[in-house]
Amino acid sequence: SGSKTAKIGDGCFGVRIDRIGSTSGMGCGSVPKPTPGGS
């Protein structure tokens, strides 16, 4: 069960970065990389 949480955090960032790119930070919500957002 713990593994799922870790994968979700990493997958959310990787998957969103591939689809949205800079919106990945905002889409995930609490991702440790709000720099690519450009805000």
UniProtKB/Swiss-Prot annotation:
It comes from the Eukaryota. GO terms for molecular function: hormone activity; toxin activity. GO terms for cellular component: extracellular region. Disulfide bonds join 12-28. One of its GO terms (biological process) is regulation of blood pressure. Pfam families: ANP. The keyword Disulfide bond applies. Residues 1-8 form a propeptide. Keywords: Disulfide bond, Hypotensive agent, Secreted, Toxin, Vasoactive, Vasodilator. Expressed by the venom gland. It is found in: Secreted. Snake venom natriuretic peptide that targets both NPR1 and NPR2. Exhibits hypotensive and vasodepressor activities. Belongs to the natriuretic peptide family. This is Natriuretic peptide AsNP-a.
